[in-house]
Amino acid sequence: MAQKHEQAPPDLPEQQEAAPEPGWLAPELAEEFPGLGIFTTTLAAGPGRSPEALKERLRELSDRFAGQQAVVLRQRPIPWAYRVFFRHIGLDPDDTWTPVEQLAFDRMHDGRFKSRNRLDDALTIAIAEVGVALQAFDAERVEGRLGLRLSAEGEPFEGRVSPLPPGTIVIADERRALAVLFGKVAEGVGVQRKTRRTTLAAIRVKGVPDVALEEALWLASSAMLA
């Protein structure tokens, strides 16, 4: 899992509709959390069944992502940056694991990375290889650009009976909150079996270079389109 960020990623995969682009960030978040940001890309693909080549990549990754490597994972710069950010927003990273640490636990618990579908397998590969936090949405349910902001007083959230607590950091489009940052996705906006276009979002925190986000999005897109 050596991280090689000095090289630019290869050309865009076919069917990836645009190069990763930065999303918007609410001014109050930019002031409170320097380095916080979101990058997105959209591709003409949905979940579907993973081809054998993608399953083989998961098997190879399982062999490399084990033992001592998984144990020392949190000490690496990118996972550590997310752990620091978790503490800043009131999450204990020893109780609420960062995405890559959750994958490490799943790998050790299951004995391997289990193949689930094209999207989940692609996200597993990208998150495990680079360490960047990724989220996926049904592109047809996204209105405009994605960004990060604080929830408003009494703001509704699909799938939740009560409003979001005010001041919750959310991933949002230009109309509504789509997900709690590092938390639950609103009902009906995540990737589903019928999804044909997927928007991938990479979350940047202080200490995570932009090139790492671009690499993670490229890896996930390439795997989905393989």
Language model regions located:
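Charge-biased, low-complexity intrinsically disordered regions
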Residues: 2-226
